[in-house]
UniProtKB/Swiss-Prot annotation:
One of its GO terms (cellular component) is dendrite. Residues 77-164, 208 are cytoplasmic. Residues 1-34 are annotated as: Disordered. The lineage of its organism: Eukaryota, Metazoa, Chordata, Craniata, Vertebrata. Residues 1-55, 186 are extracellular. This is Transmembrane protein 222. It is found in: Membrane; Cell projection, Dendrite. The keyword Transmembrane applies.
C-alpha cells in the first residue's frame, strides 16, 4: 500500500494542454481591394467600374467618329486603373472620362517603362496631367492624344521618347481591344449606316 500511495502522484499528473489553434487574420477592406487588382499575381481590370490599370483607353466622339471611326477620345490610366484624360482647355479629367466610358483599351506592359525612380508609371501620368492643366485644347495639334503621348515619353515607354498622336492612333487601332460587342457596334454602326446612305444616293443618281 505504501508503494501504491507513493506512486500515485505520478499517475495523477494533469494532461498537457492541447495545442493552440493558429490565429486567422481577417483581411481588411484595403487588402480585399488589393486582391481584386493584384490577385493571381497580376493586375485585374474591372470594366464595370471603368478600371483599366496600365492601359491607354479610347472612346468614340459623337459625329466625328461617325465619319472617321479611327478618331476618338483617348486617356491613360494609372497603376490602379484610374483614367486621366485631357478633356478640355486647361482641364484634365480624373475617373470621369469625357464622352463616356471607354469602348476600347490598349494594355501596356509596365515592365517596358525605362524611366528611373519609384512608381515611374504613375509619376509620368501625374506629371503629364499637371502639364496639360496649363494648356489650351487644340483638336488638330495639342489634344487628348498629345497628353497620353507626353505621359509615355516621360516614362520612356518601350525606351522611346518619340510617342505622338499619330503613332498612338495607329497602335490603338492595331492593338486595342473593345470592351464588349456593344462597344464595337457603337463605334462602327454609325459609320456603316452613313456609308450605306452615301452609296445608295450615289447609285440612285448614277442610274438616272
Amino acid at each position: 500500500m505504501a508503494e501504491a500511495e507513493g506512486s500515485s502522484p505520478l499517475l495523477l499528473q494533469p494532461p498537457p494542454p492541447p495545442p493552440r489553434m493558429a490565429e486567422v487574420e481577417t483581411p481588411t477592406g484595403a487588402e480585399t481591394d488589393m486582391k481584386q487588382y493584384h490577385g493571381s499575381g497580376g493586375v485585374v481590370m474591372d470594366v464595370e467600374r471603368s478600371r483599366f490599370p496600365y492601359c491607354v483607353v479610347w472612346t468614340p466622339i459623337p459625329v466625328l467618329t461617325w465619319f472617321f471611326p479611327i478618331i476618338g477620345h483617348m486617356g491613360i490610366c494609372t497603376s490602379a486603373g484610374v483614367i486621366r484624360d485631357f478633356a478640355g482647355p486647361y482641364f484634365v479629367s480624373e475617373d470621369n472620362m469625357a464622352f463616356g466610358k471607354p469602348a476600347k483599351f490598349w494594355k501596356l506592359d509596365p515592365g517596358q517603362v525605362y524611366a528611373s525612380g519609384p512608381n515611374a508609371w504613375d509619376t509620368a501620368v501625374h506629371d503629364a496631367s499637371e502639364e496639360y492643366k496649363h494648356r489650351m485644347h487644340n483638336l488638330c495639334c495639342d489634344n487628348c492624344h498629345s497628353h497620353v503621348a507626353l505621359a509615355l515619353n516621360l516614362m520612356r515607354y518601350n525606351n522611346s521618347t518619340n510617342w505622338n498622336m499619330v503613332t498612338l492612333c495607329c497602335f490603338c487601332l492595331i492593338y486595342g481591344k473593345y470592351v464588349s460587342v456593344g462597344a464595337f457596334v457603337k463605334t462602327w454602326l454609325p459609320f456603316v449606316l452613313l456609308l450605306g446612305i452615301i452609296l445608295t444616293v450615289s447609285l440612285v443618281f448614277n442610274l438616272r
